[in-house]
Amino acid sequence: MIQNPILPGFCPDPSIIRVGEDYYIANSSFEWWPGVKIYHSKDLKHYEQLPSPLNRMSQLNMVGEGDSCGVWAPDISWDGEYFWLIYTDVKTRTGGLFNTHNYLVKSKDIRGGWSEPVYLNSSGFDPSVFHDTDGKMYIVNMINNFKGILVQQYDPEKECLVGEAKNVFPGTGRGYTEGPHIYHIGEYYYLLMAEGGTGYEHMVTMARSRSIWGPYEEDPGNPVLTSDVDNPEKLQKCGHADLVCTQNGEWYMVHLCARPPKGSRQCVLGRETAIQKMVWNKEGWLRLVCGGRFGQWETEEPAGIPECLFPEEEGKDYGKEDFDLEIADSAGNNETAKNADIAEILSKTKEYLNEKNAVDEECDKKLSMPVKKTSALLDVRYTSLRQPYDSYTSLTERPGYLRLYGQESLNSCYNVSLVARRQQDRYVQVETCVEFAPTCREQMAGLAYMYDTGNFYLLVKTREEEFGSQTLDLKKPAKLRLIKSDHFDVEDVIPAISIPEEGPVYLRVTTTQEGLYAKIFYSLDGKDYQELAEVPTNILTDEQSDGFTGAHFGMYCHDMTGVRRYADFDYFEIVKTRKEQ
């Protein structure tokens, strides 16, 4: 059996394709950089994360975009030669005014080499590409204000939309019609949609027509998939789906879901990706193979497809990252950056850095802060806010450490120095060790547990000053602060603690009570940890933050003086402390 969710923790809005014996899923990334998460599987059960396709600011510039803006609901497709990726870059979403720009990129290799984007339209979000059996391409998207589903032909040679755009279906009447996908199966064009809103009333509905332009008849059994809201121990928020047919002719639906803790509707893990096996009934409509319409915790594995693990992926979701950059000598022997010559490291990685961490120079010129390209190379699971982290990080200036140069504070939508990982389980322990020498209270560095710019916890080293002081007093002790921001209302959870001016400080967060709370610790030697507080995590959820992402843990540094004072992080560790039920 396949256990759900297949992609845990902040992996919403899945789109799936099969190319031969390989399956690929694309997920929304919102304001998190790089844009769009891609996962690869051979058995629909085990997955490896691939490099993100939108890794240049010429493809995606989110600087200044608000919380839960950025990349919404990408769609991935394949025409036999090219992979196509269509996505929305949402600039604003406040006051019911959605500025939604849709773009298309392509590549012959899903692991890299994605083109510059082609602008399509701004008529709505959740776009998808439909490749018909006659070779024609169509762009499908919902219409802003949920007025229906728009279809228009696309000319791949001219790289533009052609012909008339038509509203082919107004929705089923359940509201919030979005997430459209079209499939040509047999004599029908099937239209798959998300409706009900992306919360607890979320659902998947279908309609069909003998022409792509309609008219479409609604599935009498709608919704095809939804959630048992009266049974909170079941998968919740099931909706926004896509379909794939295996090489053996079996059908599966991937969809987003959520896992609220018992007795709560607060989903700190955000919206995740699940999968259900499907079957076509005699009337030609799609149904869950298990019957009913509620998303299940597990589903049947595809027949005739062997289980395929990715040994190189084992342990990457959890474990300790020491930031030791490995290089190989002429004999093929590896040594870490702590023992290697920096010039040699820079020489051997220069070509790779130029390719993998390219940042559009024109976009750099538009940033308000000076850019220091130091180009850290990290696992694809690490992410940053709105722009590449290579402008403020280094793995080579102090070998064996990740150096972060401080920029703006975490409530900024512009230049924030944060390198983070999404929370994937309710019970985790996250730990890091930082060395930092602040000169004023406007300089902070440490561990962030965050949802967005207005909702977060910070455990940071800083310096204490008298309010309104005109002089710098370095005799004032360094301080450790635990800061809470609840809808931009910022306060200290506990009084600041004096800590040594020099030397490392170890920071730890351990989630408890099914992720509803988190215990905060610190240590000066990495052995004797002192508990500072136990804090609620409700501010880190979709329900409290009015967002669409999920909780992240990250290494963080800010310097609001503009000097870009740096902090050095020795390691970053995530450990699962209890097996999920």
Regions found by a protein language model. Name each.
Residues 1-581:
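Carbohydrate-active catalytic/glycan-binding domains of CAZyme proteins
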